[in-house]
From Swiss-Prot:
One of its GO terms (cellular component) is nucleus. The gene is RPN5A. This is 26S proteasome non-ATPase regulatory subunit 12 homolog A. Component of the 19S regulatory particle (RP/PA700) lid subcomplex of the 26S proteasome. The 26S proteasome is composed of a core protease (CP), known as the 20S proteasome, capped at one or both ends by the 19S regulatory particle (RP/PA700). The RP/PA700 complex is composed of at least 17 different subunits in two subcomplexes, the base and the lid, which form the portions proximal and distal to the 20S proteolytic core, respectively. It comes from the Eukaryota. Residues 232-403 form the PCI domain. Belongs to the proteasome subunit p55 family. It comes from Arabidopsis thaliana. The keyword Cytoplasm applies.
Length: 442
């Protein structure tokens, strides 16, 4: 009881001192008295009293902002030294209540929320952790370091992906502009002028900008994998591949380059896929994995690919991806790979044939006539090519896709011919009318 009474007496003395300093608007004195009270409670390991004093001091009339900020910052150092989870959660909630609605401790509130969300996640409460994180809009915090903002938003995205909330994950990911990762960190930062908002330095546990870039694209790969957006997955792996630390070590870039090759083949044929495919083929590192270089060359070359021989050759490599960086290529990857080979073969046939029987087309594609017609129809609907099927005669007619300028020029030319014809007809009619009128005169 003696120690307890001594502690209370010391706290009462410091509270009186704090009151005098606060009323005199002495920032340094108020801050010192408030932090000493918290330190006494911590040294005594009286966590209940610590929470009470934090709330009590923060609610004092005319309490100085600097004193509240110092109290919150000091109490945050005690969080990791709490004896159990319940005490830790109680202290974090107390500090959250104190910092609620106060712009001068918004960064501390964000860090506290992150700590609480981590505890909830460890307890298996993913949804609660995600909801907690989403309450904080760090993108509006002007004084928070850029890397800390990005790390916080990425944590929000990760928790949304963990709870299968892909819509919200996409919304949150759009708060990060990928160009921010390409900023030149080597440039000397300008010293802030007097009166400018000071940006706090990021804590030591926050990753660097390049590390955050990798985390960002790994999360985007998880998001795009949900809808099997192969071209976007490929672009994300390409961004990871371009990180200097990845390119320096073959153990890291070889698995990433393998993934780029696979997803390029899995992606539907379009201008972006074609551009990435040609750019990847020019990469010198591709010679280190010759099988994949040959695979890309097969896809680029306008020749019919035999599915069975291709699958037999690359089946083991396909299965090997499960044990490499990024994991398997997806549940539907095997089916989609076969579909892409069929689409490639149809494009090859359309290049060399103007007219072909459906039976011969099915033979070239190693499919039944019904399957060949189905895949051809799907490609026509997706506007990958232009074709017409004459079902009674069983003939497919391919047409060359015209550029929009060509179509416009053709239409303008036909319209000009039509107007010329109309004008000529008018002249002829007028001529005939004049001739007949002249003949009727006496």
């Amino acid at each position: 009881m003696g120690d307890s009474g001594k502690l209370e007496a010391t706290i009462d003395r410091l509270l009186n001192e704090e009151k005098q300093m606060r009323l005199a608007e002495n920032v340094a004195g108020t801050r010192k008295a408030a932090t000493e009270i918290l330190q006494l409670c911590f040294d005594a390991k009286d966590w209940k009293l610590l929470n009470e004093q934090i709330l009590n001091l923060s609610k004092k009339r005319g309490q100085l902002k600097q004193a509240v900020q110092s109290m919150v910052q000091q109490a945050m150092q005690y969080i990791d030294q709490t004896p159990d989870i319940e005490t830790r959660i109680e202290l974090i909630k107390t500090l959250n209540n104190v910092s609620a609605g106060k712009i001068y401790v918004e960064i501390e509130r964000a860090r506290l929320t992150k700590k609480l969300a981590k505890i909830k996640e460890e307890q298996g409460q993913i949804a609660e952790a995600a909801d907690l994180m989403q309450e904080v809009a760090v993108e509006t915090f002007g004084a928070m370091a850029k890397t800390e903002k990005i790390a916080f938003i990425l944590e929000q995205v990760r928790l949304c992906l963990d709870r299968q909330d892909f819509v919200r994950a996409q919304i949150l990911s759009r708060k990060i502009n990928p160009r921010v990762f390409d900023a030149d960190t080597k440039k000397d930062k300008k010293k802030p002028k007097e009166g400018d908002n000071m940006v706090e330095e990021a804590p030591a546990d926050i990753p660097t900008l390049l590390e955050l870039k990798r985390i960002y694209y790994e999360l985007m790969i998880r998001y795009y994998s949900h809808n099997n957006e192969y071209i976007e997955i490929c672009r994300s792996y390409k961004a990871i591949y371009d990180i200097p630390s990845v390119k320096e070590t073959p153990e890291q870039w070889i698995p990433v380059l393998r993934k780029i090759c696979w997803f390029l083949v899995l992606a539907p044929h379009d201008p972006m896929q074609s551009s990435l495919l040609n750019a990847t083929l020019e990469d010198k590192n591709l010679s280190e994995i010759p099988d994949f270089k040959m695979l890309l060359k097969q896809v680029v070359t306008m020749e019919v690919i035999q599915w069975t021989s291709l699958w037999n050759k690359y089946k083991d490599e396909f299965e090997k991806e499960k044990s490499m960086i990024g994991g398997s290529l997806g549940d539907k990857a095997g089916e989609d790979l076969k579909l892409r080979i069929i689409e490639h073969n149809i494009l090859v046939v359309s290049k060399y044939y103007a007219r072909i029987t459906l039976k011969r087309l099915a033979e070239l594609l190693c499919l039944s006539m019904e399957e060949a017609e189905k895949h051809l129809s799907e490609m026509v609907v997706s506007k990958a090519l232009i074709a017409k099927i004459d079902r009674p005669s069983g003939i497919v007619c391919f047409q060359i896709a015209k550029d929009s300028n060509e179509i416009l020029n053709s239409w303008a030319g036909n319209l000009e011919k039509l107007l010329d014809l109309v004008e000529k007809s008018c002249h002829q009619i007028h001529k005939e009318t004049m001739v007949h009128k002249a003949a009727l005169r006496p």
